[in-house]
Amino acid sequence: MFEAPVPMPRLAPQPPIYFCPKAAGEFVLDGNINKPFWNNVPFTEDFVDISGGDFPTPRFRTRAKICWDERNLYIAALLEGNEIWATIKQRDSVMYYDNDFEVFIDPSGSTHNYMELEMNAFNTQWDLLLTMPYRNGGRSVTAWNMPGVETACMISGEVN
């Protein structure tokens, strides 16, 4: 019998599941997660490195709250840390070297032709379409703009 080693995938075959409740109440875009709108929306599990379990647990806690209504998807993130660093102020600039928050939206679940939105502490946005993951030879379409996106950022502390 022929046996070949099968490497363990770098990412868990089944990502964590988050129940995304329907929004209740009136939403105000101001970056403040401590408002009644968010009170009944549960936090996600703490975020981990996208590269998988072989990587260390992040030094600082990051988690999010997500809900929806007939018109919008609402995402609030709480990023903890004692240093808030941002340099990028021009839209659609590579910003993952800053402290940033990234959202990946893959409606088909195929990891192909998915949307990415990043924002930093200055509320600078980088939205792009990815043909497939970079590790699989994917290319980003930075000229693409995510329709209807609005963001806000609230900082507790000083930037830089």
Q: Locations of the language-model features?
A:
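Structural preference for beta-rich elements and adjacent junctions enriched in aromatics
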Residues: 1-160
